[in-house]
Design a protein with these regions (language model features):
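Catalytic core segments in nucleotide and nucleic-acid processing enzymes
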Residues: 1-125
Length: 125
């Protein structure tokens, strides 16, 4: 989805995931965020990027997807924004480390299913 930040249609941006019905916007980061214990621990530019998406898309929920070493990491870190409000969430995604492509495909499907199962309750709210 191409998003434009300004009324003159300038400032093109591309969030990685946007669900229009539930107004949730997510961006994938290929960085180690596992040490974060709250959203504000994340690099400021990454937070500002998601807040910008949330504001322009009138979204109440925004988040960052990030790689995790833990196989079953489903701990979602959430923080509520001041001002217009909204919730930011950090979503850990297990990226399998395997010896061959077929094993990777099988294991990443499990990871994708976990992500979808974690997102469903949020999308329904």
């Amino acid at each position: 989805l191409q998003t434009k930040l300004f009324t003159d249609n300038s400032g093109k941006r591309y969030p990685d995931f946007y669900h229009a019905e539930s107004k949730i916007v997510l961006d994938a980061k290929y960085k180690c965020l596992e040490r974060a214990t709250k959203v504000s621990d994340v690099e400021r530019n990454d937070i500002h990027q998601v807040i910008s998406y949330m504001h322009v898309l009138s979204s109440n929920i925004g988040g960052l997807l990030y790689p995790s070493k833990a196989e079953s990491s489903t701990t979602l870190i959430q923080s509520t924004l001041k001002g217009y409000g909204g919730t930011m969430i950090l979503f850990p995604i297990h990226i399998p480390v395997v010896d061959n492509w077929n094993d990777f495909i099988q294991q990443i499907k499990v990871t994708e299913t976990r992500l979808i199962n974690d997102l469903i309750p949020i999308l329904r709210n």
